[in-house]
Amino acid sequence: MKPSNPIQTAEDQLDSQQQHASLRPWASLRYRDYSLLFLASLFVTTAQQMRQTQNFYQVYELSGSAFQLGLTGLAQGIPLFVVGLFGGTLADFVDRRKLLLLTIAGNFLVAAGLGFLTTTGAIRVWHVLVGTALTSGLNIILNPTRMALISRFVPRSHLTNAVSLNSSVSQSAHFIGPMLAGLSLAWMSTGYAYLFNALFYAPAAAGIFLLKIPEMPQRLRENFSMRSFLGGFRFLWRQPVVMTLVLLDFTIVGVGYYRPLLPIFAKEILNVGPAGFGALSSAPAVGGMLGTLLLLCIGDIEHKGLLALWSFLSYAVGLGLFALSGNFWVSLLLLGVLGLANSLQAVMRQTSFHLLTPDHLRGRAFAVFNMFSQGANSVGATEVGFLAALIGSPGSLLFGCTVGGILTLSCWAALPGLRKFGSEKTRRAAISL
């Protein structure tokens, strides 16, 4: 007998694959635990974006130094490579709900600590750098753990929808977080802005506390060892679909990481002021939100690999056209296309991860996923800046366009299994490529 409550657990309908063709945009929110995770993720991700904006603002306010801003970015990036795998391993060997609660509590304490130091006048730049590094380390544990839970709460037929909704959280947070940070800094002191940020972790913790996470079957459990610690890398190596998508993202987004060059394009090429620069910076997020909305309306995608390849190719072409554009409105549109393409391939990558990764490996696999995904931005910022100094900003992005286009077309031709990878029906055949 089916439950009358519209909020159901994923275990109730694990075999409801026939529903995937007509899913509503909010279908995954019918599942109680996924909806709780969704709301908690919204508060956590918004708070993360708020804090990042507040940290950069305060460092510049205290030092007036661009070099110190660079150190802030370094403090944020180093923990990614130092403790990234450790965070994913914890997600697979420690109770995930407790792990989420601990990392959320840690984020709250960092925000409250920075707020206290600022309001008392004791704050120094190094305090903010340490707080940034601590926050980054906590989030390296929090984010893979949170992502690993998605497929525990919805059936496979809902995975694309669930991941798309999760992507909408990220896209929304990139708007809401910086906006709230700016408003809080304008309306109150920096110290109270940090305390305001800390409040966002309370509803997130409440949502996580109410989660009912299905226990992992005994046969899937394993003991901790160095071999298990490296399980995420071994999984990637043995799954050509996932490995290819991760490397495509790392390379194409890395060599085509345009964001550090936007101030140059705004001032020297498009001749627009701060307002124009703000519009250029926001355009990719608008495109990303449109991409997420499109996937939510369509539902499950039969040819996930093919859509990912088209998205990578569109990103490369859009990047080249943006590099050549001298018109502000055309550039604005092209940046929206870049955000749209990046959003589509990101959802396809994450969905493929969930489809192909066993639950006992999911935390470690998503830790590697995050290392490559976020590492692409750090490596890309260095690469495009160096090339821009040598051959100019347009030349740097044209190089990224060329590399991205060649790499995507090569994978398209050489890996037919990637093109065919899609829903559950084609999953097994695509694994072997």
Label the model's feature ranges.
Residues 2-6, 72, 82-86, 93, ...:
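C-terminal transmembrane bundle of multi-pass solute transporters/carriers
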Residues 19-79, 234-282:
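Helix-loop boundary and gating motifs at the non-cytosolic
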Residues 42, 123-141, 250, 330-344:
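Hydrophobic core of transmembrane alpha-helices in multi-pass small-molecule transporters
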Residues 55, 141-154, 344-357:
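Intracellular juxtamembrane helix-capping segments at the cytosolic ends
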Residues 57-63, 115-120, 176-196, 268-270, ...:
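Transmembrane alpha-helix termini and helix-breaking/packing motifs in multi-pass membrane transporters
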Residues 60, 150-155, 160, 267, ...:
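Helix-terminus/helix-capping segments at the ends of transmembrane helices and short amphipathic helices
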Residues 131-172:
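Cytoplasmic helix-loop-helix junction between adjacent transmembrane helices
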Residues 148, 152, 190, 194-224, ...:
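Helix-loop junctions on the cytosolic side of multi-pass membrane transporters
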